[in-house]
Every structure is written in structure tokens, then in C-alpha cells.
């Protein structure tokens, strides 16, 4: 009888442990959509400088919520990779400039970002 209860206890702990593992794994992978636009850039990126030049003179800059994230920060770099992976962009193909929209769309490159912003 003791072996039976011990077996049930081990099985129960295994099931609970597995559930907790998958629940925390899913929570780490799921990243909600931002309330505004997220723009990822680098100080050493010439294409980012082109986007910044456009943004400085862009009339619509006050009409949207845009959070600029410099990727030399490890936290911002990790967030960029997670955002890109949500658009099925592999780690090897992630680059800046990179714009992530509130709808979950990824836009990469200076001209695509500038053209997208002009349409807003």
C-alpha cells in the first residue's frame, strides 16, 4: 500500500513539475505587443543615422508614440531578437534599423522604415 501511495506521489509531482516548466517556458516566450512603436538602432549604424535624420524633420513625429531602443544595451538587444523572432526573422538576419509596430509588424532597413512612417 505504501508503494502505491509513493508511486502516486511521484507521478503527481512529475505532472505538476512538467506543467510548471511548460507554463514558465511559454510565459518567457510570449511577449505582448507594445502600446506604441519600438525603434531599434545603433550609434555605429549609418542606415540608422539616415532614419534619425528623417525622424528629426518628420512632421508626424508628435502624432505617434515611438520608443527608441539603442541595441548596445543587452536588454534592448535581447528584446530586439525576441521581437524579430515573432516575425519569423532568424537571429542571423536581425539587424538595425528595425521598427516594431503596435500591430506586431517588423520593418527592417532605412528606406522601408522611412516609407512606412511617411504613410502614417
Model-derived features: where do they sit?
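Thiol-based oxidoreductase modules, predominantly thioredoxin-like and allied folds used
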Residues: 63-82
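Extracytoplasmic/secreted cell-surface and envelope-processing proteins
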Residues: 48, 76, 107-110
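Local sequence-structure signature of Cys/Sec-based thiol-disulfide redox active-site neighborhoods
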Residues: 27-69
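Hydrophobic membrane-insertion alpha-helices, especially the h-region
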Residues: 7-21
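Non-catalytic, surface beta->alpha helical segment in thiol-disulfide oxidoreductase systems
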Residues: 100-120
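Extracytoplasmic/secreted envelope proteins and their assembly/folding machinery
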Residues: 51-55, 77, 81, 114
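Short, structured active-site "lid" loops
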Residues: 83-104
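Feature marks short, highly hydrophobic, charge-poor N-terminal signal-anchor/signal peptide-like helices
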Residues: 2-5
